[in-house]
Amino acid sequence: MDRWTRGATISLACGMLLALSSAPAFIVPPADPGTAKGVAAGMIFAGGAVEIAAGLFGIHRERGRTDVVLGLLSVATASILAFAGAIGAMGFLFLLGAWLLARGAIELMGGLAAETLAAVAAARLIRGWMDILVGLVALIGSLAAAFPLLLLSWPGTIVRSALLFVAASLLASAGLHIWLAAWFGRPGRSPRG
């Protein structure tokens, strides 16, 4: 198996694992913010570990630094979520919004710094803007929660939307890796052409 086929296989596996790590957002009903924190921390940690692996061993090793940095950011965020004491629904959503904004900024920088294959750069730019948009929605939602009369059942709404924000980010990352696998898995394709 040549380098590109092996890299495409790894990228496909990473994409599928990222998609699977988003499943708890759709399956687990958040009973309380504590349970949702644990679920989100697990999802983010799993996604971060997969992104680190994709950056180190995937098809686009030359630009894998971006994936490694995103993975490290995700692992750090998951650690904060898992080991932070009492963090309420508003703080939970604020932390996830900040995480998404940071991911979006890193994706944008990675897309702008890409030297080869404009399609990968474009995919990173699109994903970066998506993370920034979702992060802004999360931050605005956490600020709106300061006015509890606006949202009568805001803790449950915030917790559910926070899990969906994490799932959206993981699915976007999965899409990028699956697309890379499909593109480079064909004979004669390489990141240089």
Residue ranges and their predicted role:
Residues 1-14:
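N-terminal membrane topogenic signal
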Residues 15-24, 37-57:
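Hydrophobic, membrane-facing alpha-helical anchors
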Residues 27, 144-158:
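Membrane-interface helix termini and inter-helical loops of multi-pass transporters
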Residues 31-46, 90-101:
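Structural signature of hydrophobic alpha-helical transmembrane segments
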Residues 49-60, 108-116, 178-182:
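C-terminal ends of transmembrane helices
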Residues 62-73, 121-126:
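Cytoplasmic-side transmembrane-helix entry/capping segments in multi-pass membrane proteins
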Residues 79-86, 132-149:
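Hydrophobic alpha-helical transmembrane segments in multi-pass integral membrane proteins
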Residues 81-127:
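Membrane-proximal helix-loop-helix units in multi-pass membrane proteins
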